[in-house]
Structures are given as structure tokens and as C-alpha cells.
């Protein structure tokens, strides 16, 4: 994978030192090459403001904000003493560069100033860190639980919080406790600074979800309505939370791969990619060219499958019933191809540390060539049925629109960002897995509205088909898995060669590989935007900290901005155009 440019190391670090004093920062070396700086909490807000708005080509995109419980970490060479570390990851799209800021906090009453005033996207991220780690953000407009239920005791991503049900008391839900839990979910407008009435009218408060079909999962949006007009909206997430990051601390590096399939569960093995690439970077594994191309081909098939589902449900939510049935037929053809060489449809867990699970079978290209000939005609038909439909255009053009600046302020990536006219695609900007060897275009929109978000994804399917065709025509020969001691599972044919290889195979399969200590963040252009895994290894067989940065999480945070002043029917189109699944949000 191409690393971020070194320009930020040459310019932004000295600039920060000049602005705040060289003795203020402590630099840390990480496996991903991103400039990582420790700084005191007292200059946090000013540093974020400086990076986001006071320099040329600013680091305006808050890619991630998370934390690490450092209390039982063994390998912290050269890092400041810290019980909890809060991590800020910012990206400059103009520089194509990243910077990572870290702040050390004590074990007792860990607290930081909130940066929401200078970076609106930090709102949910700070709430998540408070929810999961118990780190307080002073000055946050409404610091309350985000993922866990309001009545939850403790902070799950602390190391002293139980990781398994067997470590906790048996679960029971008496009637009185159930009533308390239900009451805790009641929406109280005053808690969100909302008025129940104005001079002219009494406002209506409506729960859209968590069981409404148009919210695409277990998800609630509490609406403040003046008649049919939306005055304000409060997205309520967490109903689909399964503790994916916590589980990463209790699974071996290899056995965690199936869990990644089920984050954006419509993206299938594409979810494996940033995770296995991150482990490979920590382990120093060079993946063979054939394996890289197989990964690209499978990822693009999953992109098409995911976009077909989006396309059909988008049309359905806006009022068309027929397209989704035809698109599901095409989606099944894609799954038939995927199943022919992975053995599974949606959750194949096909990627491995060091390569892929198996080589392509004999005659693997036949179904693909048939699909390449078939699919463009179907897309042309869908253009006539959906994109050219006057009802679709009236319902989606000018609805839920935002600018490029607003998208970056709210950490929007993927098709939602490109719909504003910015041609920023991670596969082009920072090619990984050999994407630099493929010819494809980056579709963009102009208005940043619901219609453009759909149009960008439709064109992306055509570009994915181009990439797949190049994979078929130029599939390299060679091994499908790296010859490396930490490749997992190791090549089976070596197990009976001698006792050393047999022992290595046994240990790798049972305990799992021992990955060297370090930190790394690897990001890909997933189906819904930028998907990244920030892994911390403490030199063991399991991850010390597994951070999953998903695109859908910040995208839902932007719903109030897009929906204020719109009608309830417009909100349905807005939700459909975002393209999210709740497992990708809640993790």
C-alpha cells in the first residue's frame, strides 16, 4: 500500500513546532509512516484549529477520534506515561497527507477539552470515547452515551471491563427492569435543547424507527416537526452494537478475520482487506502479485453487489417497486461468481494474512466473462427506468444537498464526498493492492444532493466492471499466499517437511501468529466510503487494541444538517441516498 506523502513530515511538523514550541511535542514512530505527535491537553483545541483552518491546504478532515487503554500495555518504548491515550487522526486531501495527535491522560478522572466548536464531526466521536472509555470532554454540547444503553454500567473498552458473558453475572430482565429500560429510551426534547412549542405552533415529535423499513436497520431518528416540515432531527444509534472492537482483543490475529466480514456485511471480503493489510504491515509481509489482483477482483465484485442493493432500495424508498427485483437477480449472479471461487456468497472471509484462502479454480473466468458481457446492458436499462424517471428526479434533485466544505467538516467520504464534485478516491490518491496498475475513472457529481449520490454509485459499478475485466485479462501467475513465517495459516504442504515446519504450523493454527509490537492504520476505499483499521500490537497473538473506523458512522451524524427545513418524505430519500448499514455504524 502506498504510504501518505512525506510532505507533511517535512512541513507540518516543523510548522507545529514553530507555532507552539518545539519542546511541546514528542514524536513517535509508527509502522504506517504517519507523523504521530504527543502534545499536552492545554493546546489541543488551538492545535486542531491551526491544522484545520489556519494553514495552507489544511488538515480539514477528521478521519478518526478514538482512545486506547494503556494500563496493561507492555511495549511503550519512548512514549509518554499514559493510562489512557486519546488519538486524533486528521487528513489533508489537498496535501494527500495525514497527521496523528495523541494526548496522555491519567487513570483518575481523565478529561480533555472538547473540539466540537472547531470541528463539528467530533461530536459523535467524543461521545463514543466517553461511552466506551469514560473519558470526559469538557465543553461538549451534550455528552451522553451514544452506543450503549443509557442505563449501562461501566465503559466497555476499558481493559478491566468484562469481555465475555461468562465473566459477568447471568443476564435477567424482570418486568420492572424492562420497564425502566424502555423508559430510559423515551425521547425528551429538552435534553437536546428543543422547544415543545413556538409562538405560532405546538411541535410534534415523531420517532422514525427503530423498526421503520426506511431506516435500513435498527435505527431511530427522533424528529421535531412543524406540520410536515422537519425542524430538527436527532439520530439515535447503538441498537446493532455487538462489541466488534472488544472482540478483537480476545481473538487471534487470524481468527478475527470472519468478524470483519460482518461490519459492513454487504461489503463481504472487502472488509477483510484493511484488516489483513494492517496485520501484514506490522508483520512485514509482502503479498504476492497474484494474491493482490485476486483481492482487487473480489473487492470490486462486492462493490457491485453492494451498490446494486443500494440502487434497488433507493428506487424503492422513493416510490418504485420494480427495479429492486431486477437488481436482486443481478446481485445473485454476482454472488454466484463469488461463491464459485470462495465457497460462500456474502461472508466468505476469503482473505488471509499474507494472501487469500486458496487459488482460483480451473475455469474461474467463464462466469466472469459472461457477466462482463451481460451487465452493461442491464445498467443501461436501469438508467432509463430509474435515473431518467421524472418522479425520481423530482424527489431527489436538490434534496439533502451539501457542499464539499460541509462534507469535509462532517467527515463524509466515498460517494457522498465525490457527489459534491471532489474527485477524491483512495484507490487513486493512495493506491493499495496494486490499484495503480488499473485504468478506471473517478465519477463525480456537481450538486451533492440525493440524485448525485445515486448517480455516482451507478457509474462506480461501470468502473468496477472495467477493473474486473482487467483482472481477468491480466491475472498474473505465481503463488496465492506469501512465503513468510507469519503468513496464516502457513502453507499446508510444508507441515510434513520437518519437525520445525510442523511445530510452526501447529502454533500458527492453534495459538496464532505472534505479531511484532507496533501501531498501524490501513485504509481502503470501501463500498460506503473510507474504511480503516487502526491496530495496536503488544507483541502477542492477539490485538491489544482494534479500532474500526467505518464510513457510515460519521455519515449518519450529518442527517440533521441535511434534513432541517425538509419534509418527512424528503428524509426518506435522504436516508436512502446515504447508503449505510447499521452494523457498519454500531460495530
Curated annotation (Swiss-Prot):
The protein's enzyme class: translocase
Reaction(s) this enzyme catalyzes, per UniProt: a quinone + NADH + 5 H(+)(in) = a quinol + NAD(+) + 4 H(+)(out)
Any one GO MF annotation of this record: NADH dehydrogenase (ubiquinone) activity
Cross-referenced Gene3D superfamilies: Cytochrome-c3 Hydrogenase, chain B, NADH:ubiquinone oxidoreductase, 30kDa subunit
SUPFAM superfamilies to which the protein is assigned, alphabetical: HydB/Nqo4-like (SSF56762), Nqo5-like (SSF143243)
Record flagged with keyword Signal: no
Disulphides: none
Membrane disposition: Peripheral membrane protein
A GO biological process held by the record: respiratory electron transport chain
Entry superkingdom: Bacteria
EC number annotated for this UniProt entry: 7.1.1.-
Cellular compartment(s): Cell inner membrane
Chain intervals for the UniProt region annotation (NADH dehydrogenase I subunit C): 1-178
Alphabetical keyword list: Cell inner membrane, Cell membrane, Membrane, Multifunctional enzyme, NAD, Quinone, Translocase, Transport, Ubiquinone
Main localization category: membrane
Signal peptide bounds: none
Single GO cellular component term: plasma membrane
InterPro entries (alphabetical): NADH_DH_suC (IPR010218), NADH_DH_suCD (IPR023062), NADH_Q_OxRdtase_suD (IPR001135), NADH_quin_OxRdtase_su_C/D-like (IPR037232), NADH_UbQ_OxRdtase_30kDa_su (IPR001268), NADH_UbQ_OxRdtase_49kDa_CS (IPR014029), NADH_UbQ_OxRdtase_CS (IPR020396), NDH1_su_D/H (IPR022885)
Region of interest (NADH dehydrogenase I subunit D), residue spans: 202-587
Similarity field: In the N-terminal section; belongs to the complex I 30 kDa subunit family. In the C-terminal section; belongs to the complex I 49 kDa subunit family.
PANTHER family reported for this sequence: NADH-QUINONE OXIDOREDUCTASE SUBUNIT C_D (PTHR11993:SF45), NADH-UBIQUINONE OXIDOREDUCTASE 49 KDA SUBUNIT (PTHR11993)
HAMAP family in the record: NDH1_NuoC (MF_01357), NDH1_NuoCD_1 (MF_01359), NDH1_NuoD (MF_01358)
Subunit structure: NDH-1 is composed of 13 different subunits. Subunits NuoB, CD, E, F, and G constitute the peripheral sector of the complex.
Role, per record: NDH-1 shuttles electrons from NADH, via FMN and iron-sulfur (Fe-S) centers, to quinones in the respiratory chain. The immediate electron acceptor for the enzyme in this species is believed to be ubiquinone. Couples the redox reaction to proton translocation (for every two electrons transferred, four hydrogen ions are translocated across the cytoplasmic membrane), and thus conserves the redox energy in a proton gradient.
Annotated protein name in UniProt: NADH-quinone oxidoreductase subunit C/D
Lineage of the organism: Bacteria, Pseudomonadati, Pseudomonadota, Gammaproteobacteria, Methylococcales
Gene giving rise to this polypeptide: nuoC
Amino acid at each position: 500500500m502506498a504510504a501518505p506523502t512525506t510532505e507533511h513530515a517535512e512541513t507540518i511538523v516543523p510548522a507545529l513546532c514553530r507555532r507552539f514550541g518545539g519542546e511541546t511535542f514528542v514524536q513517535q514512530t509508527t509502522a504506517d509512516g504517519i507523523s504521530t505527535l504527543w502534545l499536552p491537553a492545554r493546546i489541543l483545541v488551538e492545535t486542531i484549529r491551526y491544522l484545520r483552518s489556519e494553514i495552507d491546504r489544511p488538515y480539514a478532515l477528521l478521519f478518526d477520534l478514538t482512545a486506547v487503554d494503556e494500563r496493561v500495555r507492555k511495549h511503550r518504548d519512548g512514549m509518554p506515561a499514559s493510562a489512557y491515550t486519546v488519538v486524533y487522526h486528521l487528513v489533508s486531501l489537498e496535501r494527500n497527507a495525514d497527521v496523528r495527535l495523541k494526548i496522555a491522560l491519567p487513570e483518575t478522572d481523565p478529561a480533555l477539552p472538547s473540539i466540537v466548536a472547531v470541528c463539528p464531526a467530533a461530536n459523535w466521536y467524543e461521545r463514543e470515547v466517553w461511552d466506551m472509555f469514560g473519558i470526559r470532554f469538557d465543553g461538549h454540547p451534550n455528552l451522553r452515551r451514544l452506543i450503549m444503553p443509557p442505563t449501562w454500567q461501566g465503559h466497555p473498552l476499558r481493559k478491566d471491563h468484562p469481555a465475555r458473558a461468562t465473566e459477568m453475572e447471568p443476564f435477567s430482565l424482570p418486568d420492572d427492569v424492562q420497564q425502566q429500560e424502555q423508559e430510559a429510551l423515551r425521547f425528551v426534547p429538552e435534553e437536546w435543547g428543543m422547544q415543545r412549542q413556538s409562538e405560532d405552533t405546538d411541535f410534534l415529535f415523531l420517532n422514525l424507527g427503530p423498526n421503520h423499513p426506511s431506516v435500513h436497520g435498527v435505527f431511530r431518528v427522533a424528529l421535531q416537526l412543524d406540520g410536515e416540515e422537519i425542524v430538527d432531527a436527532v439520530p439515535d444509534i447503538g441498537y446493532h452494537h455487538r462489541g466488534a472492537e472488544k472482540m478483537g482483543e480476545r481473538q487471534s490475529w487470524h481468527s478475527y478475520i470472519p468478524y470483519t466480514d460482518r461490519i459492513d456485511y454487504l461489503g463481504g471480503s472487502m472488509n477483510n482487506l484493511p484488516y489483513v493489510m494492517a496485520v501484514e504491515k506490522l508483520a512485514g509481509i509482502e503479498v504476492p502479485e497474484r494474491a493482490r489482483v485476486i483481492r482487487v477482483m473480489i473487492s470490486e465484485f462486492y462493490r457491485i453487489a453492494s451498490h446494486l442493493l443500494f440502487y434497488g432500495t433507493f428506487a424503492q424508498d422513493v416510490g418504485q417497486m420494480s427495479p429492486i427485483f431486477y437488481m436482486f437477480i443481478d446481485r445473485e449472479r454476482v454472488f454466484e461468481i463469488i461463491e464459485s471461487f470462495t465457497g460462500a456468497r456474502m461472508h466468505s472471509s476469503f482473505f488471509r494474512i499474507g494472501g487469500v484462502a486458496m487459488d482460483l479454480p480451473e475455469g474461474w473466468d467463464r462466469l466472469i466473462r459472461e457477466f462482463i458481457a451481460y451487465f452493461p446492458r442491464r445498467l443501461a436499462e436501469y438508467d432509463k427506468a430509474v435515473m431518467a424517471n421524472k418522479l425520481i428526479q423530482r424527489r431527489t434533485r436538490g434534496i439533502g444537498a451539501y457542499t464539499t466544505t460541509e462534507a469535509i467538516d462532517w467527515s463524509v467520504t466515498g460517494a457522498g464526498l465525490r457527489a459534491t464534485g471532489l474527485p477524491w478516491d483512495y484507490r487513486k490518491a493512495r493506491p493499495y493492492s496494486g490499484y495503480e496498475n488499473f485504468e478506471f475513472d473517478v465519477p463525480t457529481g456537481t450538486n451533492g444532493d440525493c440524485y448525485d449520490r445515486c448517480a455516482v454509485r451507478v457509474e462506480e459499478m461501470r468502473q468496477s466492471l472495467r477493473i474486473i475485466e482487467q483482472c481477468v485479462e491480466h491475472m498474473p501467475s505465481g503463488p496465492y499466499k506469501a512465503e513468510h513465517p507469519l503468513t496464516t495459516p502457513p502453507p499446508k504442504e510444508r507441515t510434513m517437511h520437518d519437525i520445525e515446519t510442523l511445530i510452526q504450523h501447529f502454533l500458527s493454527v492453534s495459538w496464532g501468529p505472534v505479531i511484532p509490537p507496533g501501531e498501524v492504520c490501513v485504509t481502503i476505499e470501501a463500498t460506503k466510503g473510507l474504511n480503516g483499521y487502526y491496530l495496536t500490537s503488544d507483541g502477542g497473538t492477539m490485538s491489544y487494541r482494534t479500532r474500526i473506523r467505518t464510513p457510515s458512522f460519521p455519515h449518519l451524524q450529518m442527517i440533521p444538517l441535511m434534513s432541517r427545513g425538509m419534509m418527512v418524505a424528503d428524509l426518506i430519500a435522504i436516508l436512502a441516498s446515504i447508503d449505510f448499514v447499521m452494523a457498519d455504524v454500531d460495530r
